Structures are given as structure tokens and as C-alpha cells.
Curated annotation (Swiss-Prot):
One of its GO terms (cellular component) is large ribosomal subunit. The keyword Acyltransferase does not apply. One of its GO terms (molecular function) is structural constituent of ribosome. NCBIfam families: PRK00099.1-1 (NF000955). One of its GO terms (biological process) is translation. Gene3D superfamilies: 3.30.70.1730, 6.10.250.2350. Forms part of the ribosomal stalk, playing a central role in the interaction of the ribosome with GTP-bound translation factors. Part of the ribosomal stalk of the 50S ribosomal subunit. The N-terminus interacts with L11 and the large rRNA to form the base of the stalk. The C-terminus forms an elongated spine to which L12 dimers bind in a sequential fashion forming a multimeric L10(L12)X complex. Belongs to the universal ribosomal protein uL10 family. InterPro entries: Ribosomal_uL10 (IPR001790), Ribosomal_uL10-like_sf (IPR043141), Ribosomal_uL10_bac (IPR022973), Ribosomal_uL10_bac_type (IPR047865), Ribosomal_uL10_CS_bac (IPR002363). This is Large ribosomal subunit protein uL10.
């Protein structure tokens, strides 16, 4: 279906707005993936706070101009599916990586975070805010418990020396 100039401008503006508000972006090729599987992916993306769209490469190049995802322009070849993470930087990467494991024909082309091309595994393994807080609290709790044990051990040793 041919798009007129106004439609193209609207697509570029919409993708540009999504890119400006996004934390990270992931590019993939979905050739060969069934419509049912893509529908499942889109549903999972909505639930994860990820906006996904298939966009023509020329329009996508214009849309990401001047954004931190301009570094991805070399990956805009063939059918391009772009996903922007809006709530957590690793959300789109984690979603695409899990989907690629289950679907051999789904190919991840690249990912960007903070203006640089990143490894998909790096982004997919980033902890969420809640996970990071839990890790921090675990580390703090572990340090406090260790200090308490060492204090009691020192007190025990001191009492044994006095006796």
C-alpha cells in the first residue's frame, strides 16, 4: 500500500516522539514469524511498557535523526521491527530475546541504550528497579550480619582470654 506524504510525515513524527521518550531501542527482523506469534509478541510488549512498530527503513532513518538512537541506522536493512522501552531500559531487549529463543526465524539486529549500540544480552540482563533495590538491600543486610558475627566472635575471644 502506497503512503502519501502526509501519512509518511505522521509516521516519522510518531516514531520520533516515541524515540525521544524511550530509554532504549531494539531492532529486529520478523520475516517468517506467523501472525499469531507476532500478535502474542505485541500483546506482551504492551504489558511490558514497550512500544513496537514495523516501519520502512527510509522513514525510520528520518525518525531517529537527532535522537540517541541514530547509532542504529546501519541496522535498518530489510524488514525492520523497532521496539522502544519506555519504563525500563531492558524491557524490549528481554522481550525480544525471550521471543527469539522460542522463534528461530525472529532475528535481533541490534540494540541501543544511552546513544550507543549495546549487546542485547547486556540490556536483557539489566535488573529492574525493584530487583536493583532488592540486591542493594541484600548486600547491606549481609554486610550488617557479617559485622555483627565478627563483633560477637571478637567479644567471645576477649572473654576467653580473660578467663
Amino acid at each position: 500500500m502506497a503512503l502519501n506524504l502526509q501519512d509518511k510525515q505522521a509516521i516519522v513524527a510518531e516514531v520520533n516522539e516515541a524515540a525521544k521518550g524511550a530509554l532504549s531501542a531494539v531492532i529486529a527482523d520478523s520475516r517468517g514469524v506467523t501472525v499469531d506469534k507476532m500478535t502474542e509478541l505485541r500483546k506482551a510488549a504492551r504489558e511490558a511498557g514497550v512500544s513496537m512498530r514495523v516501519v520502512r527503513n527510509t522513514l525510520l532513518r528520518r525518525a531517529v535523526e537527532g535522537t540517541e538512537f541514530e547509532c542504529l541506522t546501519d541496522t535498518f536493512t530489510g524488514p525492520t521491527l523497532i521496539a522502544f522501552s519506555n519504563e525500563h531500559p531492558g524491557a524490549a531487549a528481554r522481550l525480544f530475546k525471550d521471543f527469539a529463543k522460542a522463534n528461530d526465524k525472529f532475528e535481533i539486529k541490534g540494540a541501543a541504550f544511552e546513544g550507543k549500540i549495546q549487546d542485547i544480552d547486556f540490556l536483557a540482563t539489566l535488573p529492574t528497579y525493584e530487583e536493583a533495590i532488592a540486591r542493594l538491600m541484600g548486600t547491606m543486610k549481609e554486610a550488617a550480619a557479617g559485622k555483627l558475627v565478627r563483633t560477637f566472635a571478637a567479644l567471645r575471644d576477649k572473654l576467653q582470654e580473660a578467663a
